[in-house]
């Protein structure tokens, strides 16, 4: 397996290069289980974060990051858009999403109780990686339907075309790769 070496929030990491299809590979960024990286990324993102009332992310890879950001910032509450409706939800908002790391359409669900808390509040959208923007768009739709105001969009890494977006903040750029592991220009 080939790897892409990069420094993220001052820490060196090796990302395995994984095929998406016969023409595209990605550097697999997995924050799960990497406590030092999670802490460092949260700290660096908070340095550039706009003023917000609540954070939101999509299940699953943004969870450790948003939790650590909330902990460091002293936030008592953050929101999680789930991949499935849960029995404990009092009602749900539902939007469809298709991202580069998933092979099929998925849905994101937000509990009505959380949506009520978002009304009129400044919501900061956070994720581990922004690539095609589909997951981000789904989160935006959830926040808007809940009556929240999006005050910013942040990620640890901006992948591919996301690097050219002016409406997101991120720590590092992550290129896309050819099937042989070379960087796409």
Stretches with model-predicted labels:
Residues 53, 121, 151:
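Conserved acidic residues
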Residues 75-123:
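Short, glycine/charge-rich flexible loops or terminal/linker lids adjacent to PRPP-binding catalytic cores
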Residues 74-76, 147-148:
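A short helix->loop->beta-strand "cap" motif at the edges of active sites that frequently abuts
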Residues 52-59:
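Short glycine-rich phosphate-binding loop at a beta-alpha junction
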Residues 1-52:
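Active-site-facing substrate-recognition patch
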Residues 65-73, 140:
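Short Gly/Thr/Asp-enriched flexible loops that form oxyanion-binding sites at enzyme active sites
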Residues 59-65, 132:
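Gly/Ser/Thr-rich loops at beta-strand to alpha-helix junctions
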Residues 137-185:
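PRPP-dependent phosphoribosyltransferase catalytic core
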